[in-house]
Amino acid sequence: MSKEFEQISIKPGFMKHNGGVLFRAISENEYEFKSIINENHLNAAGITHGGYLSALIDAGAGTAAHRAAGNAPCVTISLDIKFIGGSKVGDEIIGHTKILKKNKYSCLFILWAKM
């Protein structure tokens, strides 16, 4: 699988506007994605906006599902996030996705992120 991260948000759109997402495959069912926090990602309190982190997680998980589905279009149906800490400018957020089950119509996975 790929050792280096690749930019996945190269088309115009929301994630490119927010700085893009770096992504790599660890195995057929495991993937990693990352982003480095900059000033555009901060909320009024000076920490990373939860909306940006949610979008990052959704993009990373969506790309993993897309790859696992043989590059078929995929959408997020449910996303549950628990924030347990804050991040700031310069922090690197790394997400890890592990696909637990997949079939023709759905993909179930667990995802966690750290800085």
Residue ranges and their predicted role:
Residues 1-115:
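Terminal targeting signals and extreme-terminal segments of soluble enzymes
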